[in-house]
């Protein structure tokens, strides 16, 4: 029977999650969905000083926005301390780990001496029990660390789904501390216990964890487990080619939401930031899950391109449902001081959205319908609202007031009739109408704008020219 696929996302809640971080959730989520497996969320919060519930909330909020649903969790490492201590005790009892009384000062001196001899600094196994080896009496009043008995000789070998075969000599690895003097377990140990207890089959994570992997594999095997498949993702670089980070100006995932990006656009962009399905650039969430595999993960660092993300967002805005876009855009309009009443927002969105790269830009374009009475520049009024144009404006207003139905087609026909009657070109009449009704010279098609403003508003504002 084939083992059920189980993947995990295991962030540290330190207050900030950017696109590079959330990609380490997206890929294991997609793989679990593709394989009809389970996706687990684990919060690695053992760094008590830097961890916070607010940061956990940001992680959950970011995942919810992208609809990365979880099957189990969130599990919190700080709530599993008793389990870690239990396994530490079992390992000491079984001879897989031992108490080490070497002080920090002694360890520093040892490493300094090794450096002076040109050797790699490492613990020398002084307190490691071996057959026939006599250990000194433990010093009084010293709380020991617990070290894992790393295998001597041989190598740790694994076939990384991204990097290929990796082989690390055990001689490069010293005996890892798995519990501190106060009994708290260390990061690498907690990860191993969690992955075993949660039956994780595939670990898809950033390649900054490659160096941890041989140590984790050795502990897993010592505990009788089978190591998962590892896929170490290359780094995501920012526009300057540096590792993406808050310090280097990366935006948080929720920041993209707040700037007016759509979750489907961010997910589509993220999916391509280190994985490819042929030349496909635009695809749905469902297509992504159907296509995703580990074989096509990129082997080189991916570089963030804001123009590409904006292009994708523009695509999803253009093809998006206008009712949904209206709901999402309204808060942005209100943040600009607009009051959404009068003109039908769904119709306004349909009119203005095609050139917008973000919902903020949609809101900016829509604002002319919702900012109250127009306040056109006096100089522009003087330039365009001339005595010569007044008769045409009066005729237009009268004809618009008499229309049997207020539609774009009827409004357009009325403009053409007035232009023909007075021998005018469209800009000569449209510009003053724009100023009077919208308060600005640049708008979408004038017939569409007037239709959305509504008959009463248009006639009232045109009357101001009289």
From Swiss-Prot:
GO annotations of cellular component type: cytosol
InterPro entries tied to this protein: aa-tRNA-synth_I_cd-bd (IPR045462), aa-tRNA-synth_I_codon-bd_sub2 (IPR020751), aa-tRNA-synth_I_CS (IPR001412), aa_tRNA-synth_I_cd-bd_sf (IPR008925), Glu-tRNA-ligase_bac/mito (IPR004527), Glu/Gln-tRNA-synth (IPR000924), Glu/Gln-tRNA-synth_Ib_cat-dom (IPR020058), GluQ/Sye (IPR049940)
Motif 'KMSKS' region boundaries: 243-247
Record-level Gene Ontology MF annotations: ATP binding; glutamate-tRNA ligase activity; tRNA binding; zinc ion binding
Alphabetical list of Gene3D superfamilies matching this protein: 1.10.10.350, HUPs (3.40.50.620)
Recorded coiled-coil stretches: none
GO biological process per UniProt: glutamyl-tRNA aminoacylation
Localization of this protein: Cytoplasm
Enzyme Commission number(s) from the entry: 6.1.1.17
Principal place of residence: cytoplasm
Superkingdom of origin: Bacteria
Catalytic activity: tRNA(Glu) + L-glutamate + ATP = L-glutamyl-tRNA(Glu) + AMP + diphosphate
UniProtKB keywords: Aminoacyl-tRNA synthetase, ATP-binding, Cytoplasm, Ligase, Nucleotide-binding, Protein biosynthesis
Residues the entry annotates as binding ATP: 246
Cysteines engaged in disulfide bonds, as pairs: none
Residue span of motif 'HIGH' region: 11-21
Pfam families assigned to the protein according to its UniProt record, in alphabetical order: Anticodon_2, tRNA-synt_1c
Task of the protein: Catalyzes the attachment of glutamate to tRNA(Glu) in a two-step reaction: glutamate is first activated by ATP to form Glu-AMP and then transferred to the acceptor end of tRNA(Glu).
PANTHER family tied to this protein: GLUTAMATE--TRNA LIGASE, GLUTAMATE--TRNA LIGASE, MITOCHONDRIAL-RELATED
HAMAP family: Glu_tRNA_synth_type1
Protein family per UniProt: Belongs to the class-I aminoacyl-tRNA synthetase family. Glutamate--tRNA ligase type 1 subfamily.
Assembly: Monomer.
Name used for this protein in its record: Glutamate--tRNA ligase
The gene coding this protein: gltX
